[in-house]
Amino acid sequence: MSSDEDKCSLHVAHNDSDRSVSTDLQEEYEELLRYAIVNPNVECSASQPSHLRGEVAPDRFPTLAGNNPVRDTELEVGKGSDLNISSHSKSGSPRKPSHPVMDFFSSHVLGDSSSPASLSTRTDAHEINGGEHLVSDENFQKLENILDIWSSGLKTNVLSELSKWRLNFIDWHRMEMKKEKEKHAVVVKQLSNQISDLKELQKAFEISIGRKDEVISNLSRAIGKQKERIELMKSFFRWRIGHVKSRQEIYEGKLADQYFQRTLLKKVWKGWRSVVQRQWKDVVERACQARAEEVCVQISNDYEARLAMLSGALENAKAEIQKMQQEKDHFEDSMKKAFMRGVCALNLEAMTIFQNKNEAGIDFTNNKKEESGPGGPGREPSAHLDTSSSTMPSAVPSQLLPSGPLAAGVASATAFPSAASLTSAGATSASSLHVPISILSAGSAAAPAPEESYAPRVVTAAQQKAGKTITARITGRSDFGSKARINSSLAIMGVSPPMGSVVVEKHHPVTVQTIPQATAAKYPRTIHPESSISASRSLGARPGHAQSLSVQSIKVVD
């Protein structure tokens, strides 16, 4: 494709140059004829363009015009007009691509063939016009000169164009040959590569064919060996089938003999068992019965011995429990007596101390009670006490209280805390007396008495004797550690067990008071007896006998 395009471009270039020369020559020839056949009046004007046209030829053919110096000057003057005419002819002529040599011959042959006809027609017209108008000899001479110059220029132009075309054709031919050689080399290289690839492929195919031949030969040998093996296996299995059949027949005969013998043995064994089973069953039943009787007798003897032993231990335990219960009752009675004696002593000592001061307080509280009434809904709020906790069930059944001096001590202890508390707003020091009494009792036939409320008594320093401080604290210690007792009941206050001893401690007087102590004396803490009572646990109940316990804490601050 590239070579065809180069050819077309080269042909177009040659054709353009060829067409420009032929068209220029033909146009000049027509102008000469036009100026040669004119009227006499126009001869002078026609002669000047002919000279100008004659001056163009030496410009194009310098080799021929170089002998005449006059023509050289004329050619220099006529260069501009000739260039304009040639440019006009080039732009007006059409361009047709063709081979340069064929274009040259075809254009000139056609030009030569057309030029005589045009000359003949023009000569005829000239003759006709000449008959009418006279033509001078000078004009004929000029025309002859111009025609000579034109023919010589045409010859030189044709020869130069032919030489150019020849050179161009040779160059084009060389280029085409070079391109064709390059293409040929590329094609040869491609073909050589293909040949080498095909040779390698041929070698690979030969190798694969050889391998396939080897595989085929190996398979054929393996198939032959397999056929031989199959034939051997067929013969072997035929022999084996016959051998197995013969052994099977022998084994079936043995099985039949064994089955026959077993059936005979079963029949014999069933007959023997039916005979022997009756006697054996009776013997076994007698033996089992005798053994069971012996075991039952032995078990009954063992259980009787164990029962007697356990009943004796139970009696001993009951006697010990009763003895311990009696000791406990005696110990509790002695403890109550000792405790009440101590309480009575403390109460008497406290009453002697506060005898003079308490009379006014008791009278004051009695007046308040009478004013509020026995069934009054509330107390005076000035008594700095928590009324919700001022009452406590402290009643004790009358039949449970001890007789004699114990009863008197209990009566005095229960009557003393019932006094109302008194406070003095202007006092800087305060003394308080807290006497909580709790008596808990348990009895199966005892009926509870009506409850009596009490409140802690607060006595100010104005009601006491100056310079005397008595602080008493009673603590109890448990003498027995057993927690569970049978057939007894025990009432415990707080977390303290029944008291075995009473310890009274006296403290030195406190003379330095601080603001918190004064505030505490002014607003004493209310005791909630209900919160200090724990549930009593019943350890055993004895009808007609009750147990009671009282704990008292006294604190006097001067």
UniProtKB/Swiss-Prot annotation:
Phosphoserine modified-residue sites: 81, 93, 548
Coiled coil ranges: 175-209, 300-340
Keyword Transmembrane helix (UniProt): no
Keywords in alphabetical order: Acetylation, Cell cycle, Coiled coil, Cytoplasm, Cytoskeleton, Phosphoprotein, Repeat
Segments for region (Disordered): 1-25, 53-102, 364-400, 532-558
Subcellular location(s) of the protein: Cytoplasm, Cytoskeleton, Microtubule organizing center, Centrosome; Cytoplasm, Cytoskeleton, Microtubule organizing center, Centrosome, Centriole
Predominant place of localization: cytoplasm
Tagged with keyword Cell cycle: yes
Top-level taxon of origin: Eukaryota
GO CC annotation terms, alphabetical: centriole; centrosome; cytoplasm
PTM remark: Hyperphosphorylated during recruitment to procentrioles in G2/M phase.
Residues that bear Phosphothreonine: 23
Bias-annotated ranges (Basic and acidic residues): 1-21
GO terms for MF: identical protein binding
A GO biological-process term: negative regulation of centriole elongation
Function: Essential for the assembly of the distal half of centrioles, required for centriole elongation. Acts as a negative regulator of centriole elongation.
UniProt record similarity statement: Belongs to the POC5 family.
Protein name listed in UniProt: Centrosomal protein POC5
Species of provenance: Mus musculus
